[in-house]
């Protein structure tokens, strides 16, 4: 398929980080609001906020986020940022998106976690009204931070549960802070009633995927370490888990050292549920259309495959049952003309 056709395909995205996905124009607006100097030249600014094509590691990749953190410290900035990412998604025919962020990273200048979430939800709502997309929020704890900080944040933001906030996650340094370290807090938070997704297996540790599945988590981000793990793949499928795949990001961070190390084909051939995602649109210099192009190029993914992956994404989403039904109907209708070709 040509790029223009891939762009026209209806899409759903489950794994997109707010602070890693801001457009250059919005970064400039945010910098002006924060009175922070950034390069006026697009190529210079892009170099500042985009990770190298090949990083030394995940931690090397994450350094890029340090540039954005000071720009997301006010309600106005957070609302603008959330609106920007929704707009970007809608313009490439994403009909459903879950945008995740860590309130802790926007609390440097006195905002509370509740204020951070409120501001992000305001931006999501503006984008939904303007573009006809459905956009939800996932709140992340940072793995490397004190568990007490994440515990307090998760508890405090519950007032927004099912008012746009639909789930929780842990992001950050997986290698040193595996699921076992987070297990008790994850169980506590699951008791609140909102679902969990979790970054798992991005650092090359299959056991971290096992631990996440054993916590009853039904959506896992990256799962790169499932590659060539036959028993783990069987467990993944038996537990009805959906993979949130992030191809470009995984190659950058060396989670997958080569295209052959990326687990998509093994997941697909085994009948596992999966979704295709950007992870970080700006940091990885990508969007969903680019990701789809790469899947066509490297894996010969077909329109029928994309339809199936988007069905999986919507079914595994944290949207309400009624929203899922409407989104699935919209998805099927959008693909009818392409499937017939």
From Swiss-Prot:
Q: Which positions are annotated as binding substrate?
A: 17, 19, 172
Residues annotated as site: Important for catalytic activity: 222
- Top enzyme category: hydrolase
State the UniProt keywords alphabetically.
Answer: Hydrolase, Metal-binding, Nucleotide metabolism, Zinc
Reaction(s) catalysed (UniProt annotation): adenosine + H2O + H(+) = inosine + NH4(+); 2'-deoxyadenosine + H2O + H(+) = 2'-deoxyinosine + NH4(+)
- Annotated residues that bind Zn(2+) are located at 15, 17, 199, 279
Q: Which BP terms does GO give this entry?
A: adenosine catabolic process; hypoxanthine salvage; inosine biosynthetic process; nucleotide metabolic process; purine ribonucleoside monophosphate biosynthetic process
Its protein name is Adenosine deaminase
Name the species this protein comes from.
Answer: Streptococcus equi subsp. equi (strain 4047)
From the UniProt record, report the name of the gene that encodes this protein: add
């Amino acid at each position: 398929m040509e790029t223009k056709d891939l762009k026209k395909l209806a899409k759903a995205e489950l794994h997109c980080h707010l602070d890693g996905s801001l457009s250059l124009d919005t970064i400039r607006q945010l910098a002006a609001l924060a009175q922070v100097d950034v390069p006026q030249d697009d190529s210079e600014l892009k170099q500042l906020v985009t990770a190298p094509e090949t990083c030394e590691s995940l931690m090397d990749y994450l350094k890029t986020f340090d540039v954005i953190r000071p720009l997301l410290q006010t309600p106005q900035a957070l609302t603008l940022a959330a609106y920007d990412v929704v707009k970007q998604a809608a313009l490439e025919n994403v009909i459903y998106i879950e945008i995740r962020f860590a309130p802790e990273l926007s609390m440097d200048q006195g905002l509370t976690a509740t204020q951070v979430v409120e501001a992000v939800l305001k931006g999501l709502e503006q984008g939904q009204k303007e573009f006809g997309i459905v956009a939800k929020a996932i709140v992340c704890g940072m793995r490397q931070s004190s568990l007490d900080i994440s515990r307090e944040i998760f508890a405090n933001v519950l007032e927004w549960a099912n008012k746009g906030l639909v789930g929780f996650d842990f992001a950050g340094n997986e290698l040193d802070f595996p699921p076992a370290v987070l297990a008790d807090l994850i169980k506590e938070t699951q008791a609140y009633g909102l679902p969990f997704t979790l970054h798992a297996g991005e650092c090359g540790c299959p056991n971290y995927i096992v631990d996440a599945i054993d916590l009853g988590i039904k959506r896992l981000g990256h799962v790169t370490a499932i590659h060539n793990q036959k028993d783990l793949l069987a467990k993944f499928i038996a537990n009805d888990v959906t993979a949130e795949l992030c191809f470009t990001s995984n190659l950058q961070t060396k989670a997958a050292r080569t295209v052959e190390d990326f687990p998509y084909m093994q997941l697909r051939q085994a009948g596992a549920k999966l979704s295709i995602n950007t992870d970080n649109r700006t940091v990885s210099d990508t969007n969903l259309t680019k990701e789809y192009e790469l899947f066509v190029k490297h894996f010969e993914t077909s329109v029928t495959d994309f339809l199936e992956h988007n069905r999986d994404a919507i079914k595994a989403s944290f949207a309400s049952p009624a929203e899922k039904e409407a989104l699935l109907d919209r998805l099927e209708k959008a693909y009818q003309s392409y499937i017939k070709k």
